[in-house]
């Protein structure tokens, strides 16, 4: 409880904090001054080592979860029983439980935690920023999660950690030479770091390829909603555009998602008799130059009958209107 000035009472009163609901309440009039307060500090927990609570001591909960660990660093820890501790279970039972837990716990995560500690040691020795440390840990996590690469104990682990730090430095444009990194890498030479750096490069390229394919679909879906909203496109066209974008993914159209989407918006709107959008307006909204949209339309024209939904327009209308606009572009180009 603390004393503040209530907005309703207009006088200093005791404010009560209800931790269950997160509300701050005036003790005089009951006015809720603040609602749904979020407590960002760590929770207080109480742990006792015996039944009589003689040495009960509050302790903070551990650190935040680690996003680079599969478990998020949420683990169960069973300690060996203390000589003075008393419990419902006997010491033999607790010892048995302790041994069983050690047999089933995830030793792979112990190894990656060891790698994170090694990276922390290296970045501290090189006086590197926490951003480098975080990126190097992310690289090691991807290395361990890749199908063809796994962490190994010993010198190889140190080489992987050193290569991850080196890669992170290059990505973030911080100058640390292989010689400097090798000096803090516990016996790992520059040749080993260079070798593991090449492996890491392949792992990251593989990961980027798999991510970009899924992100392209997600980003295109978001772009469809945003572009259609800005262009004030009718509901019928809004239904046709995402369907056309999805069908276009089945063809070898070597254009980035924005260019493909801009071209499809132009094609769909141009087929429409009532809601045509100028290519210049589409280009401004999509942040794509007009010539790029025109070239994308030309690339997609051979597949137009399979891309444009048949419920939106018949084949003759699609061919007639798109062929007409492409012919006009070519004529204007030759006449210049």
Curated annotation (Swiss-Prot):
Tissue: Specifically expressed in reproductive organs and seeds.
Positions of TFIIB-type zinc fingers: 2-34
Record's keyword annotation contains Metal-binding: yes
Compartments where found: Nucleus
GO cellular component: nucleus
Pfam family, one: Zn_Ribbon_TF
Reported consequences of knocking out the gene: No visible phenotype under normal growth conditions, but embryos of mutant plants display a reduced rate of endosperm proliferation during the syncytial phase of endosperm development.
Major location category of this protein: nucleus
Binding residue positions for Zn(2+): 6, 9, 26, 29
One term of GO molecular function: zinc ion binding
Entry keywords, A to Z: Metal-binding, Nucleus, Transcription, Transcription regulation, Zinc, Zinc-finger
SUPFAM superfamilies the record matches: Cyclin-like, Zinc beta-ribbon
Highest taxon, organism lineage: Eukaryota
BP terms from Gene Ontology: endosperm development; syncytium formation by mitosis without cytokinesis; transcription preinitiation complex assembly
Biological role: Plant-specific TFIIB-related protein involved in the regulation of endosperm proliferation during the syncytial phase of endosperm development. Does not contribute to RNA polymerase IV or V activities in reproductive tissues.
Record's protein name: Plant-specific TFIIB-related protein 2
Lineage: Eukaryota, Viridiplantae, Streptophyta, Embryophyta, Tracheophyta
């Amino acid at each position: 409880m603390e004393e503040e000035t209530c907005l309703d009472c207009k006088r200093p009163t005791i404010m009560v904090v209800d931790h269950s609901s997160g509300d701050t309440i005036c003790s005089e009039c009951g006015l809720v001054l603040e609602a749904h307060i979020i407590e960002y500090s760590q929770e207080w927990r109480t742990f006792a080592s015996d039944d009589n609570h003689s040495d009960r001591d509050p302790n903070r909960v551990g650190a935040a979860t680690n996003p680079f660990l599969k478990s998020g660093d949420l683990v169960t820890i069973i300690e060996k029983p203390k000589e003075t501790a008393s419990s419902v279970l006997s010491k033999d039972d607790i010892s048995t439980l302790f041994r069983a837990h050690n047999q089933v716990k995830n030793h792979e995560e112990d190894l990656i935690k060891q790698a994170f500690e090694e990276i922390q040691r290296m970045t501290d020795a090189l006086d590197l920023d926490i951003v480098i440390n975080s990126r190097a840990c992310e690289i090691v996590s991807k290395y361990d999660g890749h199908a063809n690469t796994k962490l190994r104990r010993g010198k190889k682990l140190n080489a992987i950690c050193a290569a991850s730090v080196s890669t992170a430095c290059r990505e973030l444009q911080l100058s640390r030479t292989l010689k400097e990194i090798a000096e803090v890498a516990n016996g790992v030479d520059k040749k080993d770091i260079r070798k593991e750096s090449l492996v890491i490069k392949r792992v990251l390229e593989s990961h980027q390829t798999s991510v970009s394919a899924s992100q392209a679909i997600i980003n295109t879906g978001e772009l469809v909603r945003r572009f259609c909203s800005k262009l004030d496109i009718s509901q019928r066209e809004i239904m046709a555009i995402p369907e056309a974008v999805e069908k276009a993914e089945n063809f070898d159209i070597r254009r980035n998602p924005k260019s493909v989407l801009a071209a499809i918006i132009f094609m769909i709107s141009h087929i429409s008799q009532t809601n045509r959008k100028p290519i210049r307006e589409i280009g401004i909204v999509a942040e794509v130059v007009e010539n790029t949209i025109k070239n994308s339309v030309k690339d997609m024209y051979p597949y137009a009958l399979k891309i444009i939904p048949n419920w939106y327009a018949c084949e003759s209308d699609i061919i007639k209107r798109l062929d007409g606009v492409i012919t006009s572009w070519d004529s204007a180009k030759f006449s210049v």
